[in-house]
Every structure is written in structure tokens, then in C-alpha cells.
Amino acid sequence: MFRGATMVNLDSKGRLAVPTRYRELLNEQSEGQMVCTIDLHQPCLLLYPLPEWEIIEQKLSRLSSMNPAERRVQRLLLGHASECQMDSAGRLLLATTLRQHAGLTKEVMLVGQFNKFELWDEQTWYQQVKDDIDAEQSTQEPLSERLQDLSL
């Protein structure tokens, strides 16, 4: 399980160094094989260990290519999916097109989200956190039943 937000730097080749605390787990889970794709709703990337991505691919394969909305999701997620292998120094090379899509330059936030990571431009991440907190504080919407059951 991945959790927490960590600032990492992209090097001049577009590689990010995976924090040490995740490397052993990623090597155990996927031998360092990862898949990166775009997020459909946020300006970030999604980074999955290969076995977790294969579960997503199975779900995508069950969607109908005859349904325009389902076809769009297949096209966006699969069409942008890029395999990346963690090297012996714990670095992942991110495809240029993916980095451009998410506006990633130098400072990147690696955000653990259970079975995957999100990759955000650092400033965009902090703005998103602010926007999310503001939205939670000002919302008039009733909490969903699942959120009501979430006791912190």
C-alpha cells in the first residue's frame, strides 16, 4: 500500500528517483515494472505497479468499443499507457508526452493512493490540496453514506 506525499525531482532526462521506502515493495510486487498513464479527471499522471495495471486492463477490456463513452476511456487510458522499468538506481523514466500532459518539469509530487501513485507538478499539487480543503469547508452537499461511516 502506498501512502503519503513526497517531493521528488525529475532529472534532465525525465527520470524520477523512487523514494527508498517504496523500492523494495515495488521490486517484490512487480520487479520494478511500472505503467504510467494519464488521469481522466485531474492534471496528473497515474503510476501503477504492473500487476495492478493488469487488473485495470482487464476491466478496460470488458468495456464495449461500440459505446462512445467507454471507447473514450479505453482510448485515453490505454493510448497513454507507457511501461517504465525501475533501474538499479531506483529511477523511472517518464515518457515525454506524459510529462507534458501533466506539466511536469523539475519538482514533482509523488502521492501514494493505495495501489498506485499520482504524479503532480508540485505547485499544481499544492493548489489542488488548497482547493480540496476549501471545497470541503464550504460544501453544502450531504455526506455520502460511505463518508458518514468513515470515522477518523
UniProtKB/Swiss-Prot annotation:
The lineage of its organism: Bacteria, Pseudomonadati, Pseudomonadota, Gammaproteobacteria, Enterobacterales. This is Transcriptional regulator MraZ. Forms oligomers. It comes from the Bacteria. Negatively regulates its own expression and that of the subsequent genes in the proximal part of the division and cell wall (dcw) gene cluster. Acts by binding directly to DNA. May also regulate the expression of genes outside the dcw cluster. Keywords: Cytoplasm, DNA-binding, Repeat, Repressor, Transcription, Transcription regulation. PROSITE patterns: SPOVT_ABRB (PS51740). Residues 5-52, 81-124 form the SpoVT-AbrB domain. Disulfide bonds: none annotated.
